[in-house]
Design a protein with these regions (language model features):
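Metallo-beta-lactamase
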Residues: 2-13, 17-20, 34-36, 98-201
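Short acidic-hydrophobic surface loop/beta-edge motif
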Residues: 6-7, 28, 85-89, 107
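Pre-active-site segment of Zn-dependent metallo-hydrolases
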Residues: 17-57
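A generic local structural motif
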Residues: 21-24, 43-48, 67-69, 101-104, ...
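Active-site metal-binding motif and surrounding structural segment of the metallo-beta-lactamase
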Residues: 42-87
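An acidic, phosphate/nucleotide-engaging active-site surface
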Residues: 84-90, 96-99
Length: 201
């Protein structure tokens, strides 16, 4: 699969699939060890991961985000951690949803103030309303995860759908959580436009 590398910053990088869902995956690097988050495999991905350091593990933040997590973990010779709890390496995990149909944790890297969300927050066009830089998942806009995530103060936010927010992430984060409900009409319109744009002419 063709992917485009993105979200380059001093603690890692990402890669994104050019499609309606804008699936985005990430590699986080700490002390020469590389943790891979919700990966979709693609051209050059394994090589880029190995070039960044020694593979340490593959982390799946959402129960239905199987993607290529298991296959890539096997290729890299590391463990596949599915919706982990507590802590792992330098990361802590925050429960976002825990229902029969939706089990999701967010990855919080306190030492670097990096937040990674699988589905709860995103930047893909069908997530956003108007000029939003970051948005709550369409199905969570009525009850956004303020209680779960609101105390965090991220400097970088990486998403499972869409490119990350690498500048002034805190402002985008607070706005997304506080305005999600009133921006529902705009989000619906944006999602329709995004869907139409991907349809063959």
């Amino acid at each position: 699969m063709k992917v485009r590398f993105c979200d380059e910053f001093d603690c890692g990088f990402g890669w994104i699939v050019h499609e309606f869902m804008e699936r985005c995956s990430h590699a986080l690097v700490e002390d020469g060890r590389v943790w891979v988050i919700d990966p979709v495999d693609g051209e050059g991905v394994e090589e880029r991961i190995r070039a960044a350091g020694a593979p340490a593990g593959v982390i799946q933040l959402l129960d239905r985000h199987n993607r290529d997590c298991a296959a890539l973990a096997a290729q890299l010779g590391v463990r596949h951690h599915v919706v982990p709890h507590g802590s792992l390496g330098p990361f802590a995990f925050v429960d976002v949803r825990d229902s029969r149909s939706w089990k999701e944790v967010a990855l919080w890297w306190p030492g670097r103030r990096v937040l990674v969300c699988a589905d709860a927050l995103g930047t893909a066009p069908y997530y956003r309303s108007g000029n939003e830089r970051l948005a709550v998942h369409p199905l969570l806009r009525v009850r956004p995860p303020r209680r779960q995530l609101g105390a965090l103060q991220p400097d970088v936010i990486l998403c499972g759908h869409g490119r990350g927010v690498l500048e002034d992430a805190g402002t985008a984060f607070r706005e997304a959580l506080s305005t999600s409900l009133r921006r529902i009409p705009g989000q619906v319109a944006s999602a329709l436009r995004a869907w139409r744009a991907t349809r063959p002419s």
